């Protein structure tokens, strides 16, 4: 039997506010456990929540960015369940009247474009964190995360493969960074998702029984987890068994999912309006203000890179996939608009490779955008070859000296005296009679031998293109 995969995602975006959504406690990551949890976060008797308006504004920014319906009046509800890292015994969330209604995101896979519909996006508070490996027989609770504002973005079950799910998640990840509502740090849990997965016979409209994979914080893990879960469900159904509706956890080391608990239904949470919080009223003036302050969005920037800068769709897509990467590239162009393609190649090539190797963000790159732009200029004006430029790049990375300083101190400037270059070429030809004969018999590959010898004699300080042209003239 042929099966169809059905995937819906719930993406949890930590909003980058300075204080929590219902208290004045700070939201900095990595602080001493329970040092950023106040009486409200601890759920102590007699305390009342106070809404952080900045969290509301950031949620609206997302809604406007995806052209979604903004609910002018929305309310907070209590989601009741017991868990050790939820001290109040309930989570403040939004059920019937979320801040963001229906919207959509467009993804591209290969040459295919697909629209993924968004059901809703609602504000809620994050829970604390249970730490199971700190003590042998006990679980530690850190409530620093409790109360951090979350925007939960819920998609329709519109995705049909793991690759579509990853493309959608990456699109949201890029967008929330562009509009500055989240830092997107998946390692620190600022951006994570739950995947609801089911399968059904191809052509059937009714959805199958779903399993929910919780708290996935990596694009790679998301793809692997979905693929494993789809295979698991297929195996169960093809053996004549039934899939159980449950919550599962992905084990990235074993590359498998395992059961956590049976999946709760909405009624199990006994939602009801929070009596301590007034409804949120959103005015037309506020919506207009948010629209006016919205920056250039990723798709708009990509289009501009293609239309105005002449980049390919692929290059523009890579460069705009991270706001910081696109910003770096545009700073390079401020002094190097004549070398757009060369700048793009170096950002996507040498720079990205070095950043990945050393596992650092582009914001912390030891080579600044103006510094790399200068290096590109030295390739463009034939001061150094591309090969030499790669060596200069490594010296720049380690020393933080400028390209010009390194070229001067190390004597890397290309030879420009054509008379001297011709003498060296003639010397190589005179000492390579066998190779000359092979070339004249039609072996063009032997040119690499000559160029290698010339590079060796000049210490790589000649322009390979010029050498190639001169060499051909001398040999013919």
Swiss-Prot record:
Keyword Nucleotide-binding among UniProt keywords: yes
Cross-referenced Gene3D superfamilies: 1.10.10.410, GatB domain, N-terminal subdomain (1.10.150.380)
Entries under Pfam families matching the protein: GatB_N, GatB_Yqey
BP GO annotations: glutaminyl-tRNAGln biosynthesis via transamidation; translation
InterPro entries (alphabetical): Asn/Gln-tRNA_amidoTrfase_suB/E, Asn/Gln-tRNA_Trfase_suB/E_cat, Asn/Gln_amidotransferase, Asn/Gln_tRNA_amidoTrase-B-like, GatB, GatB_C_1, GatB_Yqey_C_2, Gln-tRNA_amidoTrfase_suB_CS
GO MF, any single term: ATP binding
UniProt keywords, alphabetically: ATP-binding, Ligase, Nucleotide-binding, Protein biosynthesis
EC class of the enzyme, as a word: ligase
Reactions listed under catalytic activity: L-glutamyl-tRNA(Gln) + L-glutamine + ATP + H2O = L-glutaminyl-tRNA(Gln) + L-glutamate + ADP + phosphate + H(+); L-aspartyl-tRNA(Asn) + L-glutamine + ATP + H2O = L-asparaginyl-tRNA(Asn) + L-glutamate + ADP + phosphate + 2 H(+)
EC number annotated for this UniProt entry: 6.3.5.-
Protein family membership: Belongs to the GatB/GatE family. GatB subfamily.
Assembly mode: Heterotrimer of A, B and C subunits.
Alphabetical list of HAMAP family matching this protein: GatB
Functional description taken from the UniProt entry: Allows the formation of correctly charged Asn-tRNA(Asn) or Gln-tRNA(Gln) through the transamidation of misacylated Asp-tRNA(Asn) or Glu-tRNA(Gln) in organisms which lack either or both of asparaginyl-tRNA or glutaminyl-tRNA synthetases. The reaction takes place in the presence of glutamine and ATP through an activated phospho-Asp-tRNA(Asn) or phospho-Glu-tRNA(Gln).
Protein name per its UniProtKB record: Aspartyl/glutamyl-tRNA(Asn/Gln) amidotransferase subunit B
Originating species: Vesicomyosocius okutanii subsp. Calyptogena okutanii (strain HA)
């Amino acid at each position: 039997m042929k099966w169809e995969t059905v995937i819906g995602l719930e993406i949890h975006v930590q909003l980058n506010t300075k204080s929590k959504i219902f208290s004045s406690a700070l939201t900095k990551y990595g602080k001493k456990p329970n040092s950023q949890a106040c009486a409200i976060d601890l759920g102590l008797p007699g305390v009342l929540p106070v809404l952080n308006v900045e969290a509301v504004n950031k949620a609206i920014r997302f809604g406007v960015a995806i052209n979604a319906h903004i609910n002018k009046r929305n309310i907070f509800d209590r989601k009741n369940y017991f868990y050790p890292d939820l001290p109040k015994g309930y989570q403040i969330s939004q059920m019937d009247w979320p801040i963001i209604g229906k919207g959509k995101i467009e993804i591209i896979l290969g040459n295919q474009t697909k629209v993924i519909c968004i059901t809703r996006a609602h504000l809620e508070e994050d829970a604390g964190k249970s730490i199971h490996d700190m003590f042998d027989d006990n679980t530690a609770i850190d409530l620093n995360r409790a109360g951090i504002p979350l925007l939960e973005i819920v998609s329709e079950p519109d995705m049909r493969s793991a690759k579509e799910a990853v493309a959608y998640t990456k699109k949201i990840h890029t967008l929330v960074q562009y509009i500055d509502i989240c830092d997107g740090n998946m390692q620190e849990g600022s951006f994570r998702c739950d995947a609801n997965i089911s399968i059904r016979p191809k052509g059937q409209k009714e959805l199958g029984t779903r399993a929910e994979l919780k708290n996935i914080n990596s694009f790679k893990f998301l793809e692997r987890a979905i693929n494993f879960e789809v295979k698991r469900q297929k195996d169960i159904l093809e053996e004549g068994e039934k899939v159980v509706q449950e919550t599962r956890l992905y084990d990235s080391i074993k590359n498998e999912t395992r059961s956590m608990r049976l999946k709760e239904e909405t009624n199990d949470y006994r939602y009801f309006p929070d009596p301590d919080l007034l409804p949120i009223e959103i005015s037309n003036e506020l919506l207009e203000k948010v629209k006016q302050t919205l920056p250039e969005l990723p798709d708009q920037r990509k289009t501009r890179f293609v239309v105005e800068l002449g980049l390919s769709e692929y290059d523009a897509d890579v460069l705009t996939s991270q706001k910081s990467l696109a910003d770096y590239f545009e700073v390079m162009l401020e002094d190097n608009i004549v070398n757009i393609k060369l700048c793009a190649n170096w950002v996507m090539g040498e720079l990205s490779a070095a950043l990945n190797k050393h596992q650092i963000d582009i914001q912390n790159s030891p080579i600044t955008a103006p510094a790399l732009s200068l290096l590109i200029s030295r390739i463009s004006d034939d001061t150094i070859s591309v090969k030499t430029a790669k060596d200069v790049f490594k010296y720049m990375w380690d020393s933080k000296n400028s390209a010009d300083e390194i070229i001067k101190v190390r004597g890397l400037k290309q030879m420009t005296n054509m008379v001297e270059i011709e003498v060296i070429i003639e010397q190589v030809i005179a000492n390579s009679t066998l190779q000359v004969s092979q070339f004249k018999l039609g072996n063009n590959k032997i040119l690499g031998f000559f160029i290698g010898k010339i590079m060796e004699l000049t210490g790589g300080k000649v322009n390979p293109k010029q050498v190639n042209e001169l060499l051909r003239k001398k040999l013919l």
